[in-house]
């Protein structure tokens, strides 16, 4: 390799949205305490697994961290005496398994740093907020227009994204929010082109896209600065919470929620669809639509975080739509995410599931029709509508939006090509992951069918009938016509044949049970 040739990045960036599955496999006594062996698997591939050992006190510490979510998690109680009793250990092991499963099944709890670090301390040991401050300080050495006011820790769900309150040097009373995040697993745009595209974000003009004050990249990640919204996001409004609180406290199980009235849902929905249509026509994928990325400005809504896709970050709903091979383009991802957002606005709570096959009986038929076309199992498996299809739906087509200036987004052809190539790479990774998930699903269903009671009965019945057939073929069943008594050597031959048949049957039985 030439001395000055650029080195290719070979490090695979971890996708934090890939679910972690865990099994409390065994318990071992270590001097004065018990250790529980937990098998962990990242994603659907069994080879991506490892084992961690945990003491009961570590489970207690995890539970203490997760209490701010306001979710009742059933951690097995502490016991002072009889901790080494065999029955007690077996009962506690099962209780710990149930506890971890309940955390893993919750979309927000399973994506929290507490849970990830508990199961995978190797990949989650870095102090991410401190690292973010260092990167921001480096940027501010050359961009001297802002000062840091204070960090805003854990206000968002994304582990590797940090928010910092800043102020312009020439307007010290103004507050703006800076978001920093390292590159994600879907970062495919070369650094030179990426920085040029990030510089374009402040030039975007659209009534339903939040303006960016400043944006740039470094060799490690990217940042964007926007006006600070005192009232927070649409999700903050729905959950009636303070924007600066921890995201688990705000969103996991809010004490009280509110819905948008039907007319507001129509207007906000139409505005979001128009913004998505605009981005799609310009060739700029979004991919990060959810209530936490929407702000309300009077009766107008605006989308946040257009930079997420450019930086290669995985979507909030990625673990959901990877289960459906028909949701395989950036445009369809936006439609799916729109369905999740529409559900949250209409019912005042997150769906927290990939699909929905039962809606509240008092749902207005118009909105129910839209939701079923996106979130029903049949729609996710069969195909989703396009943004244009949704805009022509009666629920949105009758909405008239106020006139506004012509939207502006000019992307040079060279940068458009870089975005197009990155989009193809991102969709390729998505399809490969969906293919693996579907293959493993089919394998699991086949195994489940093979081990069903009905199939076991069929195999047992087949075992009983096979020896009789073998004997009939050898002429050993009484009533079979014979003109003379068989000679002694023939008996020996028949006996050997019967034993051989039974032996073969026994081997077949062993294989079938395996």
Task: Indicate residue ranges for each PLM-predicted region.
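Short beta-strand micro-motifs within the conserved protein kinase catalytic domain, predominantly
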Residues: 211-222
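Activation segment signature within eukaryotic-like protein kinase domains
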Residues: 268-269
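Regulatory extensions appended to serine/threonine kinase catalytic cores
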Residues: 402-514
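Terminal C-lobe "cap" of eukaryotic-type protein kinase domains
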Residues: 377-404
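Phox homology (PX) phosphoinositide-binding domain
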Residues: 1-187, 488, 500-502, 506-514
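Conserved short submotifs of the Hanks-type protein kinase catalytic core
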Residues: 220-233, 237
């Amino acid at each position: 390799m030439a001395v000055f040739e650029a080195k290719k990045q070979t490090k695979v960036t971890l996708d934090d949205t890939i679910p972690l599955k865990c099994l409390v496999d065994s318990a071992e006594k270590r001097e004065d305490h018990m250790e529980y062996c937990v098998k962990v698997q990242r994603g659907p591939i069994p080879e991506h697994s490892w084992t961690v050992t945990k003491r009961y006190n570590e489970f207690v510490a995890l539970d203490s961290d997760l209490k701010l979510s306001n979710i009742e998690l059933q951690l097995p109680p502490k016991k002072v005496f009889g901790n080494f009793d065999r029955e007690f250990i077996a009962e506690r092991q099962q209780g710990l398994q149930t506890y971890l499963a309940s955390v893993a099944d919750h979309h927000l709890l399973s994506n929290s740093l507490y849970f990830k670090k508990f199961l995978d301390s190797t990949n989650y040991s870095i102090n991410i907020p401190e690292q973010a401050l260092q990167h921001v300080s480096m940027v501010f050495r050359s961009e001297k227009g802002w000062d840091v006011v204070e960090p805003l820790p854990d206000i968002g769900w994304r582990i590797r994204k940090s928010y910092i309150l800043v102020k312009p040097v020439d307007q010290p009373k103004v507050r703006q929010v800076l978001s920093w995040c390292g590159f994600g697993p879907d970062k495919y745009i070369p650094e030179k082109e990426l920085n040029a595209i990030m510089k374009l974000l402040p030039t975007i003009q659209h009534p339903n896209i939040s303006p960016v004050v400043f944006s740039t990249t470094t060799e490690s990640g990217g940042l964007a600065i926007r006006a600070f919204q005192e009232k927070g996001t649409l999700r903050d409004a729905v959950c009636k919470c303070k924007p600066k609180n921890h995201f688990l406290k705000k969103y996991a199980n809010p004490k009280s929620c509110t819905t948008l009235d039907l007319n507001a849902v129509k207007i906000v929905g139409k505005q979001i669809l128009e913004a998505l249509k605009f981005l799609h026509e310009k060739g700029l994928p979004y991919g990060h639509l959810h209530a936490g990325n929407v702000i309300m400005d009077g009766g107008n809504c605006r989308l946040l975080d257009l930079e997420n896709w450019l930086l290669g970050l995985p979507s909030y709903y990625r673990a959901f739509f990877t289960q459906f091979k028909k949701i395989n383009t950036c445009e369809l991802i936006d439609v799916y995410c729109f369905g999740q957002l529409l559900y949250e606005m209409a019912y005042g709570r997150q769906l927290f599931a990939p699909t929905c096959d039962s809606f509240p009986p008092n749902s207005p038929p118009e909105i129910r029709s839209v939701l079923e076309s996106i979130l029903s199992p049949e729609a996710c498996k069969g195909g989703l509508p396009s943004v244009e299809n949704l805009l022509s739906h009666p629920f949105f087509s009758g909405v008239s939006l106020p006139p506004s200036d012509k939207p502006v987004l000019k992307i040079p052809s060279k940068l458009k090509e870089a975005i197009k190539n990155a989009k193809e790479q991102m969709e390729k990774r998505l399809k490969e992951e969906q293919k693996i998930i579907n293959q493993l699903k089919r394998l699991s269903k086949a195994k489940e069918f093979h081990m069903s009671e009905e199939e076991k009965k069929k195999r047992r019945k087949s075992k009983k009938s096979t020896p009789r057939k073998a004997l009939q073929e050898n002429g050993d069943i009484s009533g079979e016509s014979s003109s003379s008594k068989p000679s002694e050597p023939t008996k020996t031959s028949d006996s050997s044949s019967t034993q051989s048949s039974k032996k073969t049957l026994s081997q077949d039985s062993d294989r079938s049970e395996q």
